Amino acid sequence: MTNFNIKAPNQSIEKSLIEKINNLNKPKGSLGRLEEIALQIGLIQQTLSPSLHHPCHLLFGGDHGIERENVSVSPRDVTWQQMINFTQGGGGVNLFCRQHGFKLRLIDMGVDHDLTAYPAIINHKIAHGTANFLHNPAMNDEQFQRALHIGATLVDDCFAEGCNIISIGEMGIANTSPSSIWMSIFENLPLNECIGAGAGLNHTEMQHKLAVLQTAVDRFFAQGYQPIDAIPYFGGFEMVGAIGAMLRAAERHMVILVDGFIMSACMLAASQMHPEVLAYAIYGHCSDEGGHRKMLKLMNAKPLLSLGLRLGEGTGALCSYPIIDSAVRMINEMNNFENAHITKYF
């Protein structure tokens, strides 16, 4: 079993960080969210001079048994086809990783296809997709623990290379379904308030998806499961891998850059296991997927961008990175009033 020892950042440095930010040559609070981000990263790293080094993006791939119930407009073959596309540098995630200097790691957690011919994809396949949670738990406990461990060890590898900020993405057709269910169960909301169109379902298809997922949730509770059991019961291998990565990153006091609906749902699930993980999360964007805005509000999360994105892969998180970089540069490179020989006027 993988254990995580996560502590909330020590707040003793907070006053000094705020003083440093307020003494920069600007009206207090005039750089808004940049000041908040600089403060958060300073607390995470326990320093008055936070920094970003060797950013890494982990992209976990996996298929879902629930896809067999026609809850997604995209066929499951798209998962493996896109994973191969990523090895060729042709995906949105590739572009933004190149643009912003992220090292990209592709991980097969449970894609329903043999990808061993592609050495750029790290083979951690647990199974050829999860079980169909309409009828059975998506994974057993051994698979759940294994997925957590894989995610954690991948972060350990990044940390050993000097990485202190991690971004996480996913590729898994139908993974909006477990995300919606987690949101419903963990936030105690009706499922119809948490469901979205995924890759583009129409109204009739949405109603079918809702009926399938509601039946699965009803069966889950009828069997006496507790809310925390929803993580392995409904989750995908790629999603649990992401949770393990988030928890280990928090344990190592790394910044966690959270993407859209799927990754926010993973952070929500991670917080059910270790609430302290939330202090390490920066939310890159609010996606166009139904339910994400409400989820972020319930998590007291403030996304940096709202661009109508719903691609996944971690693309929205990666697009927000320059803002985070600007916040760190602000606290380190901007003159204070004394150095700039400017009268402090507040």
Predicted regions and their residues:
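N-terminal loops that bind phosphate or other acidic moieties
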Residues: M1-F346
